[in-house]
A protein has these predicted regions:
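Alpha-helical cap/lid subdomain in secreted, periplasmic
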Residues: 59-65, 74, 80-218
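Active-site metal-binding loops of divalent metal-dependent hydrolases
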Residues: 49, 71, 101
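N-terminal post-signal-peptidase region of extra-cytosolic proteins
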Residues: 29-31, 78-81
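Short substrate-entry loop that stabilizes the transition state in hydrolases
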Residues: 53, 75-76
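Short, acidic Gly/Pro/Ser/Thr-rich loop/turn segments
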Residues: 51-53, 190
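N-terminal secretory targeting modules
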Residues: 1-46, 53-56, 61, 90, ...
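Hydrophobic residues at beta-strand termini and immediately following loops
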Residues: 46, 69, 183-185
């Protein structure tokens, strides 16, 4: 029997019933290699499909060892549950996080403006509590956080575009409160109307293609 040092100490958060479950086994296996072999990680990118699809290892290779922990469909309140496993135990110098757009899809089911307003307020509370918890965990682990704005969208209802503006104001305010850098992708990717993503930067109005990612790199 071959003994692997520290394998029994690996944090495996389990399944939450969200999209993250689809990559949980993969990330546990990848995390075990980094954790047990004490690979020095410089940056972890945490987020949803926009992070998942981004070739961050190539874009940021000059900064050292870069790890992508993006999951398609990720939401803010589930990112909290895997932060210890996918960020803290990897001991990166920096964590770059962008998450929140997927919390908004539930708004499509609202039948009245009053119902949507109530649900928007609930989502804002989720953002607030989730970001605060992640920032607290990062501070305790002495990991520098870079918090990114939610990117703009195209071909989506107007209410979602306006809600993203509101969400980003909260995220920016939390960054200021906690003295954490706020990375403003939003304003860099806007069309001339000031609220919609520049159509030429995205495949589908949500996910950037190379043009969008090149802007995000800068």
């Amino acid at each position: 029997m071959i003994y692997i040092e520290n394998l029994e100490c690996l944090i495996k958060p389990g399944l939450f019933g969200g999209q993250g479950d689809l990559r949980r086994t993969e990330f546990d296996i990848r995390n075990s290699q980094i954790f047990c072999n004490k690979i020095p990680v410089d940056i972890v990118f945490l987020g949803d499909s926009i992070t998942h699809f981004w070739e961050v290892e190539e874009y940021f290779k000059e900064y050292g060892i870069v790890v992508n922990r993006g999951i398609g469909g990720e939401v803010a309140h589930l990112a909290v549950k895997r932060f210890q496993a996918d960020v803290v135990q990897l001991s990166p110098k920096i964590c770059v996080m962008m998450v929140g757009i997927n919390n908004t899809w539930i708004l499509d089911g609202c039948k009245t403006e009053a119902e949507r307003t109530s649900l928007e307020n609930e989502i804002m509370e989720i953002y607030d509590s989730s970001y605060r918890e992640i920032l607290a965990q990062a501070k305790a682990a002495e990991i520098k956080m870079l918090i990114c704005s939610i990117t703009p969208i195209h071909h989506q209802p107007e209410f979602r575009k306006h809600f993203i503006v509101r969400a980003n104001k909260l995220i920016q305010a939390l960054c200021e409160e906690h003295e954490v850098p706020y990375v403003d992708y939003y304003s860099k990717m806007l069309a001339s109307d000031g609220i919609t993503m520049e159509e030429s930067l995205s495949w589908d109005g949500v996910h950037p293609h190379v043009g969008g990612y090149n802007i995000m790199k800068t």
